[in-house]
Amino acid sequence: MTKLPGLALLLLLTACTIVEEVPDSLNTGSWQAHQASLQGMHHWFATGRAAINNGTESWHVNMLWLQQGNNYQIRLFGPFGAGQVQLTGNSDQVELLTSDNERFYSHNIDTLLYERTGVKMPVAELRYWLIGLPSPAGKDAASVDSHGRLSRLQQGEWRVRYKRYVSVNGLVLPGKIFADKKDLDVRVVIDEWKLGIQTLNNPFNDKG
């Protein structure tokens, strides 16, 4: 796999500890404290898998996601002719690179992915859902558990359910997320979280 210059991250990783789901309760203070800690997460790297079903077709993809502030790089492996696509961008523009080194550009990451691969996935929202926050793009109705973590979230047509949390470097982050709307079901499992700041090593090196 091609190594990607210029993207690097000081990785501070400890073993993930599973935190079991607990019943919902109204715990505003705990949620506000938990939300503040997540909003301070500007640099992270997640390795995981996603299953996507639109009622007639289904896809399974492996996923690598690097977030550095507003900049991201996402690699999806699986249903693209046994190849991969790479999405690189920020809040203004995104580039999609195919395994044939074709490059496509757009201002909408979800539309670009669908037009070039046929796969629908709420990538713009997942940036926030993956770490346990509502997307700021839409109105939401949320339920939190007794530890102040999201357990359920309604954003527009999307219903998001948090099925498992893991403890990473003192933060509690999602380990399994289900999201669905009328014509689409997306299930994401995070196998590994890496957190850190500043630049030293390319986190993709360990995966390539």
Segments from the language model and where they lie:
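An acidic-aromatic
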Residues: 71-120
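C-terminal motif of bacterial Sec signal peptides marking the signal peptidase cleavage site
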Residues: 12-15
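Gly/Pro-enriched, hydrophobic low-complexity segments
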Residues: 132-208
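Solvent-exposed helix/loop surface patches that form functional interfaces
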Residues: 111-140, 144-147
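Sec-dependent signal peptide recognition
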Residues: 2-10
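A short, Trp-centered hydrophobic/proline-enriched beta-strand micro-motif
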Residues: 34-55
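Solvent-exposed loop/turn segments connecting transmembrane beta-strands
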Residues: 54-58, 79-82, 182-183
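Bacterial signal peptide processing site
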Residues: 17-20
